[in-house]
């Protein structure tokens, strides 16, 4: 999803495009799923909320479902968008939803861009090395575990 921010009337600034990246705060039994990156090299070994870019013409929640299917092999259900927007490397911004796995779902597996997954309790949330850009969103997601 690309959003355009129009300049104010009379402004000489160019139109800026934002590309939305969706992230999933996948919650289960009071735990949050964290995914360790395996690629690209500059991110490998650090942890994130799974997700990815919204494709042109795709609704953000549909992108979230697609990305979790591609990256984790699960059909998750988006529940609620966590208020806020977190800047990533320009022109990307992160939007995060809480999500859940329907009863009887397969266990998530690290299929794409990740080499390990962990379900973290509130006490364990900060035991992993989160990507700096995900920390504010993780903080918001962790508040929903209480």
Task: Give residue spans per PLM region.
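Active-site-adjacent beta-strand/loop module that shapes the phosphate/pyrophosphate-binding cleft
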Residues: 75-76, 85-108, 118-124, 134, ...
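Conserved N-terminal beta-strand and adjoining loop/helix that marks the start
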Residues: 2-33, 53
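Short, solvent-exposed loop/turn elements at beta->coil junctions and helix N-caps
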Residues: 12, 81-87
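HhH-family (HhH-GPD) DNA N-glycosylase catalytic core used in base-excision repair
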Residues: 2, 75, 144-146
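Short secondary-structure boundary/capping segments
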Residues: 24, 39, 85-86, 107-111
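Conserved Nudix-box catalytic region and its N-terminal flanking loop in Nudix hydrolases
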Residues: 31-70
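Short, charged/polar surface micro-motifs in flexible loops or helix N-caps
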Residues: 27-32, 40, 55-56, 74, ...
């Amino acid at each position: 999803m690309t959003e355009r921010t129009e300049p104010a009337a009379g402004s000489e600034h160019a139109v800026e495009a934002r590309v939305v990246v969706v992230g999933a705060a996948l919650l289960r039994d009071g735990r949050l799923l964290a995914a360790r990156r395996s690629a690209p090299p500059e991110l490998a070994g650090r942890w994130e909320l799974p997700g990815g870019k919204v494709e042109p013409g795709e609704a953000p929640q549909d992108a979230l479902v697609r990305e979790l299917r591609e990256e984790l092999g699960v059909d998750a259900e988006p529940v609620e968008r966590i208020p806020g927007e977190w800047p990533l490397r320009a022109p990307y911004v992160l939007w995060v939803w809480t999500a859940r796995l329907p009863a009887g779902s397969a266990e998530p597996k690290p299929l794409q861009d990740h080499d390990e997954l962990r379900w973290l309790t509130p006490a364990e949330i900060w035991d992993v090395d989160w990507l700096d850009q995900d920390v504010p969103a993780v903080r918001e997601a962790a508040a929903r575990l209480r």
